[in-house]
Amino acid sequence: MDFLKEIVKEIGDEYTQIAADIDGTERFIDTGSYIFNSLVSGSIYGGVSTNKITAIAGETSTGKTYFSLAIVKNFLDTNPDGYCLYFDTEAAITKGLLASRGIDQNRLVVVNVVTIEEFRSKALRAVDIYLKTEEENRKPCMFVLDSLGMLSTEKEITDALNDKQVRDMTKSQLVKGAFRMLTLKLGQANIPLIVTNHTYDVIGSYVPTKEMGGGSGLKSVSYTHLTLPTIYSV
């Protein structure tokens, strides 16, 4: 044991510790719905994890933004000194919408992002600022990306401006790279990230199958991913 402690002391930092000393308490954010809680955590009294990535996928008008805002409201209500960074790619968040959902607008920052690179940069900088704050001065924080499917890439925009009719093959790798950088940082900071995403029909599947857009990047790092059905498919 002394040997292990010496290793931790020499090669570790504040996030390196013996497994027995790791805080094993699983914490959740109530989604505002017992059914939704049970779907994402296995308990009606649970919810989404407080330090992991949760993906909410579905077709248009299936309630992705609705559930995301419900989670934001419950998070802010539970943490009176907490705040939320809402990365909006659809210009869907308005003062009227927030007021109708009872969300404290003074504790929510709406960040408009157009490209994956822009989201990656702004999210990483925000987490870095949070981690540099003294731990006792850190207030509860959560991130929302709504939605991943609407993010473009710098290459796609450049090609469009130059009237190049070519397919952008870089998006999947950019998505994977962005979440590869963010996953551990968010975990260290205890910042939950809710990501909404679009789905598409898998061509050639034996049974009707839905898949999230953007490649496997989000699917491989999300602690929980939930696909919302359309009314006619229920």
Regions found by a protein language model. Give the residues of each.
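The Walker A/P-loop phosphate-binding site
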Residues: D2-L108, F119-D128, K132
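Short acidic-hydrophobic, aromatic-tinged amphipathic segments that line or gate anion-handling sites
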Residues: V109-V113
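P-loop NTPase motor core
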Residues: K122-S220, L226
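Alpha-helix N-cap/helix-start and coil->helix boundary motif
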Residues: A91-A92, I116, L193, D201, ...
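Residues that scaffold the ATP/ADP-binding catalytic core of kinase and kinase-like folds
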Residues: L39, E154, V234
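A conditional alpha-helix N-cap/helix-loop micro-motif detector
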Residues: I29, T65, I116, S172-K176, ...
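Single conserved hydrophobic/aromatic residue that forms the stacking wall/gate
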Residues: H225-V234
